[in-house]
Design a protein with these regions (language model features):
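Active-site phosphate/ATP/adenylate-binding loop shared across adenylate-forming ligases
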Residues: 1-177
C-alpha cells in the first residue's frame, strides 16, 4: 500500500523466520560456491531505522531490516559492519557519513541493503576515495544479497560499480508479513 505498517514482531518470530532464513541462504550459497569466503572479511549491511518508543519502555519500532540487524546473533555480529547503532540510525546523512568512515577501514566481502541506498553510499565512497569502482577498494568483494524491489533495472548500475563476472547477486524475499 506504500504506507508504513506496524506489525508486532517477537524475538521468536525473528529467529524462526528471518534469522533462520539468513542462515539457510548462506548455507545454500556456500554449497553452491565453496570458495565464497564470506567470513574472510566483513559483511556490510545498511538497514532502515529503529527507535525506542517513549511511551513503551523496552519496545522498539522500525523497519524489519533494522530489527534484524538489532537482533543479529552474536556469531554474525563478528563479521558485520558498520556498528548496529550506525546501521540503524534514523538520520540518513549521519548514517551515510559514519558508515563511510567505518567501511573504508574494513575488508568488505559481502553487502546487503536497499539497492537505491547502496548506490548513494557507493557513489559517495568512490567520490571520497577517487577510485573507479568498488573492487579497487575491496578486491575480495564477492556477494550482494538483495530483495524487496525489482532489481533488473538497477543491476546495470551495480555492474558498473562492481565490474566482475564472478560477483554474485543473490535475491531473497525478506517480507515482514
Amino acid at each position: 500500500s506504500g504506507k508504513s505498517k506496524y506489525i508486532p514482531v517477537t524475538r521468536e518470530y525473528l529467529e524462526a523466520n528471518h534469522i533462520q532464513g539468513a542462515s539457510d541462504t548462506l548455507s545454500i550459497l556456500y554449497n553452491q560456491f565453496p570458495q565464497l569466503g564470506l567470513f574472510d572479511g566483513k559483511n556490510m549491511i545498511i538497514g532502515g531505522s529503529i527507535e525506542k518508543l517513549a511511551n513503551y519502555p523496552g519496545i522498539l519500532s522500525g523497519d524489519i531490516s533494522a530489527l534484524l540487524i538489532h537482533n543479529m546473533p552474536w556469531y554474525a555480529r563478528q563479521a558485520f559492519t558498520p556498528t548496529v547503532d550506525i546501521a540503524t540510525a534514523p538520520e540518513w546523512e549521519y548514517k551515510l557519513r559514519e558508515t563511510i568512515k567505518q567501511v573504508l577501514q574494513e575488508p568488505i566481502v559481502m553487502f546487503g541493503g536497499v539497492p537505491t541506498w547502496l548506490i548513494v553510499l557507493f557513489r559517495s565512497i568512490l567520490e571520497k576515495t577517487g577510485k573507479a569502482n568498488l573492487l579497487e577498494i575491496w578486491p575480495r568483494l564477492r556477494l550482494y544479497i538483495h530483495g524487496g524491489v525489482n532489481f533488473a533495472p538497477i543491476k546495470p548500475i551495480f555492474k558498473d560499480l562492481i565490474p566482475s563476472d564472478q560477483f554474485i547477486y543473490q535475491e531473497v524475499y525478506n517480507a515482514s508479513e
